[in-house]
Structure formats: structure tokens, C-alpha cells
Amino acid sequence: MAKKIQGFLKLQIPAGAANPSPPVGPALGQRGVNIMEFCKAFNEKTKDKAGYRIPVVLTIYTDKSFTFELKQPPMTELIKKISGVKKGSDNPLKNKVGKLSKAQIMEIVDMKIKDLNTDDREVAAKIVAGSARSIGIETEL
């Protein structure tokens, strides 16, 4: 018989750095999930993605067990890391803080395509370019 789902929980946690302190501990504790078990499993699966915040979707079952699915880092984090920018522009229409080439955009598309709502790489490239422009980074598209 399949386990009965109690609920879902979405978190963004730095890769390899999950610990019982807030926000992870309280979010899991109030649902009765073994916090240390989750932290160890999450840190093990994300140790190779250090430097990124990783979105995770936890499925919590009525017997207090859980499974989790890792997503790709947020698009703006990938854009900033690949373009070498530390922070987005405070006024993206006037102040440009960096530039992305078509090759860099396609690199981001390759990482994010499974999390986007399209399978077409050209459409995905436009989504990435739009996100880049929204934080003040020029694009070659």
C-alpha cells in the first residue's frame, strides 16, 4: 500500500549547508520530520553544488517519513554567477551591471531547461534573457 501524503514543503537552502537552525529546523520540526536525517541527506546530495541556494520540495508522509526532490538553483543566481556579477542593478533599465553572450545564455538554458515551462531551447533562451534584463544585465539575444 502506498504511503499517505501529509503535505509538501518548499525551501531554498544553501548547498551542503543544511542544519537544524532556522529556517530548516522549525519548518521540519513542526511537521514531525527527523531534522538531522534530512540535513545529512540534503548535504550529501548537494555537496558538489557549493555556492548555490538549492530549491528543494519535500514530500512529507503521515508516518513522518519524507522524500525530497532537488531543483536547479534560481535563474538569477545562475545568471549572476556566470556573468561574474555580485548583485543585480538597482535600476535595471538605466544601470547595466554586466553582459551575457549567447553561449553563456545557452549554458544556463542547458542547466535550467527541465525546470522551465518549455522544451524549446530558443524559447528557454528568451526566458533566460528576460530574467537577465530584469536584473540589469545586457544580453546578445
From Swiss-Prot:
<dbReference type="InterPro" id="IPR036796">
    <property type="entry name" value="Ribosomal_uL11_N_sf"/>
</dbReference>
<dbReference type="GO" id="GO:0070180">
    <property type="term" value="F:large ribosomal subunit rRNA binding"/>
</dbReference>
<dbReference type="GO" id="GO:0022625">
    <property type="term" value="C:cytosolic large ribosomal subunit"/>
</dbReference>
<keyword id="KW-0689">Ribosomal protein</keyword>
<keyword id="KW-0687">Ribonucleoprotein</keyword>
<protein>
    <recommendedName>
        <fullName>Large ribosomal subunit protein uL11</fullName>
    </recommendedName>
</protein>
<dbReference type="InterPro" id="IPR020784">
    <property type="entry name" value="Ribosomal_uL11_N"/>
</dbReference>
<dbReference type="Pfam" id="PF00298">
    <property type="entry name" value="Ribosomal_L11"/>
</dbReference>
<keyword id="KW-0699">rRNA-binding</keyword>
<comment type="subunit">
    <text>Part of the ribosomal stalk of the 50S ribosomal subunit. Interacts with L10 and the large rRNA to form the base of the stalk. L10 forms an elongated spine to which L12 dimers bind in a sequential fashion forming a multimeric L10(L12)X complex.</text>
</comment>
<dbReference type="InterPro" id="IPR036769">
    <property type="entry name" value="Ribosomal_uL11_C_sf"/>
</dbReference>
<dbReference type="InterPro" id="IPR020783">
    <property type="entry name" value="Ribosomal_uL11_C"/>
</dbReference>
<comment type="similarity">
    <text>Belongs to the universal ribosomal protein uL11 family.</text>
</comment>
<keyword id="KW-0488">Methylation</keyword>
<dbReference type="InterPro" id="IPR000911">
    <property type="entry name" value="Ribosomal_uL11"/>
</dbReference>
<keyword id="KW-0694">RNA-binding</keyword>
<comment type="function">
    <text>Forms part of the ribosomal stalk which helps the ribosome interact with GTP-bound translation factors.</text>
</comment>
<dbReference type="Pfam" id="PF03946">
    <property type="entry name" value="Ribosomal_L11_N"/>
</dbReference>
<dbReference type="InterPro" id="IPR006519">
    <property type="entry name" value="Ribosomal_uL11_bac-typ"/>
</dbReference>
<dbReference type="GO" id="GO:0003735">
    <property type="term" value="F:structural constituent of ribosome"/>
</dbReference>
<dbReference type="GO" id="GO:0006412">
    <property type="term" value="P:translation"/>
</dbReference>
